[in-house]
Amino acid sequence: MKNIKLVLLLVFSVNILHAQEKKSPFWDDIQAFKKQDSVQPPPQHAILFVGSSSFTKWKDVQDYFPGYTIINRGFGGSSLPDVIRYANDIIFPYHPKQIVIYCGENDVAASDTVTGQTVYERFEILFELIRKKMPTVPIIFISLKPSPSRWQLRQKMMTANDKIKDFLSKQKHVVFIDVYHKMLGADDLPMKGIYLEDNLHMNAKGYAIWQKEIEPHLLK
């Protein structure tokens, strides 16, 4: 298993090196971030939010966390391999003092062959990639949320959450935040009134739940 992970890490490393040589998925999103940074250089040593559309759509995330400096680099539709591919563009240049990650939902939704174990293994690759360059930077992983439109995938989501939580329990400078159960009602179904009409993305009430769970763990 260790050899397999090393091979996968090597493959993803090669993808990172070659990401700029061809137009990989989400290339335009990444270039938009770079253009934005060139026009308005972001602060160094801020808190970096990175991941998929739950962050992309959190456009007013800074308003939820006054007193903290947030850089939001969520790009909608992305999966963990995409975050890995563009780590040199959207993680390391910012020298963040803390990294908050939400990603993995799209991995499960993309293919029937992707399991909770797959998501965990992909996250571990991302984690180890970050640790190679930033051995002590605090990392927060937000659990996969219970999206009504993806309710049929909940077992895979829960497996991914459990495996990532167990993995992080053995690491240093990390926090696993369980939003999954916080977003369920008394009937153990996703709460009503916290999602947009697509039953996938959250409205302000949904993000308020995230704010309550995340803020105690952010670094000043």
Where are each of the predicted segments found?
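A cross-domain feature marking catalytic cores of carbohydrate-active enzymes
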Residues: 103, 141-143, 206
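Conserved SGNH/GDSL esterase-like catalytic core that processes O-acyl groups on lipids
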Residues: 21-122, 148, 153-158
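Conserved beta-strand termini and adjacent loop/short-helix elements that scaffold enzyme active sites
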Residues: 73, 142, 177-179
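Charged, glycine-enriched surface loops/patches
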Residues: 118-142, 159, 163-175
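Catalytic His-Asp segment of secreted/periplasmic serine-dependent ester chemistry enzymes
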Residues: 146-220
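Bacterial Sec-dependent N-terminal signal peptides
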Residues: 1-21
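Sec-exported extracytoplasmic/periplasmic mature domains
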Residues: 88, 92, 104, 128-135, ...
